[in-house]
């Protein structure tokens, strides 16, 4: 049985992740929390374009219905 999305998020808590949003925006940060709607809280977040940091945003809440995918960040655990 494949892992459920919320189980994967739970294993990623306190780890660096990359989140891609509808419209192509990407954020990299430490996953601090989530809920059943896949709303995400990232700490020390940065907005990324073409692999480069565009700006540091610090703490950010991302609305779950805008999330395309969540992936472990390179160099993360």
UniProtKB/Swiss-Prot annotation:
Record keywords, A-Z: Ribonucleoprotein
SMART domains tied to this protein: Sm
Domain Sm: from-to ranges: 4-76
GO molecular function terms attached to this record: RNA binding
GO cellular component: ribonucleoprotein complex
Signal sequence residues: none
InterPro entries: Lsm7/SmG-like, LSM_dom_sf, Sm, Sm_dom_euk/arc, snRNP_Sm-like_arc
UniProt record similarity statement: Belongs to the snRNP Sm proteins family.
Name listed for the protein in its UniProt record: Putative snRNP Sm-like protein
Species name: Archaeoglobus fulgidus (strain ATCC 49558 / DSM 4304 / JCM 9628 / NBRC 100126 / VC-16)
Species lineage: Archaea, Methanobacteriati, Methanobacteriota, Archaeoglobi, Archaeoglobales
């Amino acid at each position: 049985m494949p892992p459920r999305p919320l189980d994967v998020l739970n294993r990623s808590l306190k780890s660096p992740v990359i989140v891609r949003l509808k419209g192509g925006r990407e954020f990299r940060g430490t996953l601090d929390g989530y809920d059943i709607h896949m709303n995400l809280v990232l700490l020390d977040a940065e907005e990324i374009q073409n692999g480069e940091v565009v700006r540091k945003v610090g703490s950010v809440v991302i609305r779950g219905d805008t999330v395309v995918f969540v992936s472990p960040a390179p160099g993360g655990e």
